[in-house]
């Protein structure tokens, strides 16, 4: 049930009295549909402008239904996506970008609270597909294949679904009940999930299970190692294993990793920030990060570092570990050259820590490919695929962390959808053709009569002094704020019923 249309933020101007702050029209407009920049920037391929318009009208369930046509995990993505759509938003040229992620989260949470159900899938095709891995890419692919009428089974090596959503993102950013309930909806739609089942031989699993196609979506769960000279090393862990142990300890009541009183994390990415903040919540007195570049050159998002510092975590910039002697960590002070690369200075310092967590990146375990002749692997350790995400083996597709791309949740989700649509076409003996795209619309093409100031809504944030557990830090929008925020959308490239 939709609500009444919101009042326009900008009143209808009387052009006989004033011309406003935008350009003056001297000719009648011509209808020319264009591509909104938010849609263009979304790695999951969401039609953001469409569901924002429905949300503005108060048609929340219809907005959610439109959203899950492209992305089955809106409550998850509204929390963990780094929202490149907002960086592209034309509204940012006037005041603030539309808080798209907050509205997506609102719709996802409303669906969970109200028990909304997806539309029925297409008629059964009679085809069976095996998905290897229950991370964001595998879950997305399974969902879209199910929507298209195919029978899908996911086989997951771990004890729980979610992949890096569960074992790489702490619960203070993504509550586990939110993840569990969105996964449960995918399974309730008809997808089968088999846990604790590591696929060792893909072709054998395909043939014995009678599957017509396979999508490999194995995440990057192997930590990259670095050789650090150590006379007598203290406890050294990798960040991926540490975060996984901490997650299982929180969810299943298992003992948390033992770190001692002081812990150092080596690395400058988002995983390093998550590891440090998780360690603080596990009770360490001091958590520090050691990183060889400066703040401007770190791979972590700026807000991640700021939140870590708010929680009392010290970041040692321009420091590189040279050797370890029990609890003493010798670091060399670095400087950046003209290209921003760290170079040694010959100056050394000693830091103290009872444990060292290495957060230097992750790799995919590609041992599953050893039994598959013909699959090409690049020197970077990723699978070579065609534009339709199929490998050189007919019917064998791959996506997410396994293929060349940036490794984010939303990109992995987009890969799952893309693979599903190409797999559907392949299973039916056809080729998938992406819908025609319109030209991208920029701010100079909007022809705004008035540039009304309407600042973005703010989500409630738990103060730093209260962040002593794994409770969620950032809250959601209420109905009024969600509709207001959706109304801030310029509806770029489309009619917004003025």
Question: Where in the sequence are the language-model features?
Answer:
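Mid-to-C-terminal Rossmann-like scaffold of FAD/NAD(P)H-dependent oxidoreductases
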Residues: 8-10, 14-30, 307, 320-323, ...
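Glycine/serine-rich phosphate-binding loop and adjoining beta1-alpha1 elements at the start
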Residues: 14, 40, 44-120, 187, ...
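N-terminal Rossmann-like FAD-binding beta1-loop-alpha1 element of flavoenzymes
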Residues: 127-153, 271-280
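Rossmann-like dinucleotide-binding cores of NAD(P)H-dependent redox enzymes
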Residues: 151-154, 158-193, 276-321, 431-446
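FAD-site-proximal beta/loop scaffold in flavoenzymes
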Residues: 234-260, 339-406, 447
């Amino acid at each position: 049930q939709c609500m009444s249309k919101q009042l326009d933020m900008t009143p209808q101007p009387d052009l006989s009295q004033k011309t406003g702050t935008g350009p003056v029209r001297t000719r009648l407009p011509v209808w020319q549909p264009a591509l909104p920049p938010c849609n263009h920037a979304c790695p999951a391929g969401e039609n953001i402008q469409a569901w924002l318009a429905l949300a503005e009208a108060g048609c929340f369930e219809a907005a959610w239904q439109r959203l899950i046509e492209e992305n089955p995990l809106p409550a998850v993505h509204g929390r963990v996506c780094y929202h490149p759509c907002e960086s592209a938003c034309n509204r940012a040229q006037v005041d603030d970008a539309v808080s798209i992620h907050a509205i997506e989260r609102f719709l996802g949470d409303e669906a969970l609270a109200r028990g909304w159900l997806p539309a029925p899938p297409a008629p059964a095709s009679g085809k069976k597909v095996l998905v290897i891995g229950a991370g964001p890419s595998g879950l997305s692919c399974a969902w879209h294949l199910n929507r298209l009428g195919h029978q899908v089974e996911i086989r997951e090596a771990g004890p729980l679904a979610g992949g890096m959503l569960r074992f790489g993102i702490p619960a203070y950013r993504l509550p586990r009940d939110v993840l569990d309930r969105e996964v449960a909806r995918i399974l309730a739609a008809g997808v089968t999930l088999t846990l604790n089942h590591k696929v060792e031989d893909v072709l054998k699993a395909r043939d014995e299970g009678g599957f017509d196609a396979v999508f490999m979506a194995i995440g990057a769960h192997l930590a990259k190692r670095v050789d650090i000279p150590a006379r007598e090393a203290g406890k050294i862990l990798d960040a991926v294993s540490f975060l996984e142990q901490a997650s299982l300890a929180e969810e299943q009541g298992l003992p948390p990793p033992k770190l001692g009183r002081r812990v150092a994390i080596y690395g400058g990415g988002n995983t390093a920030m998550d590891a440090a903040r998780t360690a603080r919540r596990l009770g360490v007195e001091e958590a520090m990060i050691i990183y060889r570049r400066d703040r401007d050159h770190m791979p972590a998002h700026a807000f991640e570092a700021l939140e870590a510092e708010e929680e009392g975590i010290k970041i040692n910039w321009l420091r590189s570990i040279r050797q370890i002697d029990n609890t003493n960590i010798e670091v060399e002070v670095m400087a950046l050259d003209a290209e921003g690369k760290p170079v040694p200075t010959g100056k050394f310092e000693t830091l103290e820590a009872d444990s060292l967590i290495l957060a230097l990146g992750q790799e995919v375990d590609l041992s599953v490919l050893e039994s598959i002749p013909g699959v090409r692997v690049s020197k970077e350790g990723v699978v070579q695929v065609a534009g339709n995400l199929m490998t050189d083996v007919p019917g064998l597709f791959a996506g997410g962390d396994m293929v060349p791309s940036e490794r984010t949740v939303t990109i992995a989700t987009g890969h799952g959808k893309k693979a599903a649509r190409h797999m559907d076409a392949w299973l039916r003996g056809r080729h998938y053709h992406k819908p025609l795209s319109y030209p991208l619309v920029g701010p100079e093409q909007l022809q705004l009569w008035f540039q009304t100031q309407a600042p973005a809504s703010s989500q409630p944030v738990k103060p730093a002094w209260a962040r002593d557990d794994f409770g969620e830090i950032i809250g959601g929008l209420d109905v009024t704020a969600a509709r207001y925020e959706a109304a801030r959308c310029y509806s770029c490239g489309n009619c917004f019923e003025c």
